[in-house]
Structures are given as C-alpha cells and as structure tokens.
Amino acid sequence: MKITGVEIRPGNIIEFEGGIWKVTKIQHTQPGKGGAYMQVEAKNLIDGRKLNNRFRSADTVEKVRLDTKDFQYLYAEGDDLVFMDKDTYEQITIGKDVVGEAHEFLQDGMDVVLELWEERPISVELPEQIEATIVEADAVVKGQTASSSYKPAILDNGVRVMVPPHITSGTRIVVNVYDREYVRRAD
C-alpha cells in the first residue's frame, strides 16, 4: 500500500531504496521558504543501518505489512538460535542479532512470535514478562529504606537486574524483558 510522506508514522514499516525500514521517529517541519516535509528516522530491519531522510508531501513510499507466525524457541547454537514452527514443526535458524539483547531472556520451550517479510525472519517478539530465579544477590545494607533503594542481582540466565532489598538468592521473580526491570515475585 502506497502512502505519502506526510502519512508516515512511528512504528510504520516502509520499503525505501531497496530496504525494509522501521520508522522510529518523525518530525514535521515547515520552513519559512519552500514546502513542508517530514524528517524521518528509521532502522533497517535486515542489517540494522540507520536512515535519516526528508519526505515531502508529494513523495510516496510503500508501506509494508509483515506476516506474523507462532514459533517455539528450542536452543542456542553458537551465535544462532533455533526455533520451531508450531504448526508445521519445521525448524528455522536465526542469528542472535535479529533478536537483539532480548536473546538473553530466551528459555527452552518459550513461545515467541516471528515477524516475517517474504518468508524471511525480520524480528522476534518475546513475551513482555518472564519468570527467572535469582542466583546471586548482594546483602542488604543496614539503614536503607525499602521504598527507595534497590540492590543488584544476577538471574539464572546471567542478566543483572535491580531488585528490592527483601529479595534473596533462590527467589523466583518476574522481570520485564524489554526494560530489564523487576516487576514482582513469582507466584
């Protein structure tokens, strides 16, 4: 579907100059002379390059719709991750760079959603929150109040998070995958 330069919004996936780009930021600019334009920042979903481009109202770009499919994470193999299609049981191998830093939160058997463009994986969506066990937590410092102080802890997947003082090693907690913050104790 073609859209004009002024219809571009953050989060849109567009095809431009032979690449697939996810729009991260836009700014509408109306200079004193000349026509208005949209200043667009975008990230290439294939190789991670950044784009900074001006689109005038007369310019058109192709808005891309990605297909989504349910997969299950199986295991890591070096710098690659192996997923299984939940419908066909077919396995697919994807580089860790496609998942980004969130790959540290992948757990065997975890259900994820893959975004595909022309049958090629572009990104992986993990659940927003996961459960993990704390393997190491600093001791509580006397005199700290529970309301404002947090202490560092290391999860069973090696990720460091800040947790409240009452949380100790061996405790199962819920962590937000994308901002790496403690949410609550696991039930």
Swiss-Prot record:
Q: In which pathway does it act?
A: Protein biosynthesis; polypeptide chain elongation
Q: Name its cellular compartments.
A: Cytoplasm
Q: Which GO terms describe its biological process?
A: peptide biosynthetic process
Name the gene behind this protein: efp
PANTHER family of this UniProt entry?
A: ELONGATION FACTOR P, TRANSLATION ELONGATION FACTOR KOW-LIKE DOMAIN-CONTAINING PROTEIN
Q: Output the Gene Ontology cellular-component terms.
A: cytoplasm
What is the similarity comment for this entry? Belongs to the elongation factor P family.
Coiled-coil ranges per UniProt? none
Tell me one Pfam family matched here: EFP
**Which keywords does this Swiss-Prot/TrEMBL entry list?**
Cytoplasm, Elongation factor, Protein biosynthesis
In UniProt terms, what function does this protein have? Involved in peptide bond synthesis. Stimulates efficient translation and peptide-bond synthesis on native or reconstituted 70S ribosomes in vitro. Probably functions indirectly by altering the affinity of the ribosome for aminoacyl-tRNA, thus increasing their reactivity as acceptors for peptidyl transferase.
Q: What is this protein called?
A: Elongation factor P
Say where the protein is mainly found.
Answer: cytoplasm
Q: Which domain of life is it from?
A: Bacteria
A GO molecular function annotation here is: translation elongation factor activity
